[in-house]
Amino acid sequence: MPLRGLRFIILPIHMKTHRAIALIILASATVAALPVLAASPTLPEVKDLPVRPEMPDVMTMLDGTRVTNLTQWQARREEMKAVLEHYELGHAPPPPGNVSGTDVRSQTVLDGAANFRLVHLKFGPEQKLGLDIAVFTPAGAGPFPTIINPSFFMTPGVNFTNGMAAPTPVMNTNTPGTNASANVSARPRLNFGMPVDPERAARSFSNQLSRGYAIVTYRYTQCGEDNPNFRTNSFYPAYPGYDWGVLYGWAWGLSRIVDYVETQPFADKSKLIALGHSRLGKLTMVATAFDDRIALGAPAGSSGAGTGAYRFCGPGRGGKEGVEDMTRKFGYYFVPRLAEFTGQMEKLPFDAHWFVALTAPRPWISVEGTDDQNCVPNAVKQTVLAAKPVYAFLGVSPDRVGVNYETHRHALTPEDWNAALDFADQQLRGKDHGRKFDQFPAEQTSTNNVAPK
């Protein structure tokens, strides 16, 4: 995604260093998209990449130069984005710059303690693309810190009653210019598809609302069906010249919601949070890394292609979602090039910590379950440890990178939500609940950052 603009933010910097007190970070502006700061580097084919069992260093540029100043770090950020797009995500179109919203319906909920609006967004070529989002706000005056929460369920308030969708047909696996070749069979759509009553949805968010957070939620497949046929619907026919996998498309869609939310009086645009679970945690990782308007990223149970480092996921390494498993089952999430790392994962020139490093100096937390078999704690720990040098370089507290484990399997629980809210309170609102967000299940982790054989 091209840069939207620049903003200067003054942050405290360690006085013993030679760095300036003005830390320039990429952030939002309502101006038109600017060109990228540097041309994309020429990147080698997978077969020509070196074997690298250790986590690739975020502070070393492609030419081997060590990052020692902010100008170099900005260039390094662009390199990292280019690498992630080339080998994993694909390339997305620029922001359309024309997002608008129309209220479809509204009502009070929770006995007057909160308000609900169903909003239809329009954008893209001739504003022919759209999304329906549900906005829940606490009663009273805003602006409120706002959580954007992609959901597996239908957008609350939408009148849609076709229930579970049938499996999609097998698609042509040799379609040129797409990532369809990574998929050889149809996958059923994930569709928890009955309408969701706004009052019922508000009850599920009552804790968040009572703590002073607004919630924007929406059905994620509006941003691309979760199957190999995703290119035939949603945004993709409007942008035929892009090779993005659906994971990047989902993240791009979340950023269109940010386009709208940051213009609304209910939202404190300096306190926008993205939180999603499982594959929606993966999209949270991508969106937070590539959209600097998101003040805090909170992927939950995101597993492989999320918080879990590829080098520590998969057969013989722990968890289920290594690069082999992800590209075999979910190849349409990515560009086909990622599948070329099957059997040679140590050639990956990146890993999950790059998404966290791109988030710096903004706060980020991974919310996990101790018994989530999709991703073992060590894969998460390696990601967190490998990203922290960027936060140290930028002179901000290491507690801006957090992790929290609750006792459960692959799920998003009320305890997970409370951990994320406590972390957001601490990082964005100056409310310290006395919690530590740096604890891992000790017996399941290691400080060794080299992938096991």
Where are these regions (language model features)?
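Hydrolase active-site cap/lid region
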Residues: 285-334
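Bacterial N-terminal signal peptides
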Residues: 22-35
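Cap/lid segment of the alpha/beta-hydrolase catalytic domain
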Residues: 149-263, 303-313
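Loop/turn elements at helix/coil->beta-strand transitions in domains of secreted/extracellular proteins
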Residues: 142-147, 211-215, 268-271, 292-296, ...
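Glycine-rich nucleophile elbow surrounding the catalytic serine of serine-hydrolase chemistry
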Residues: 276-286
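Alpha/beta-hydrolase-fold serine-hydrolase catalytic core, especially in secreted/extracellular enzymes
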Residues: 39-132, 137-142, 156-159, 168, ...
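Bacterial N-terminal signal peptides that target proteins for export
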Residues: 8, 13-25
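Alpha/beta-hydrolase fold nucleophile elbow
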Residues: 266-278
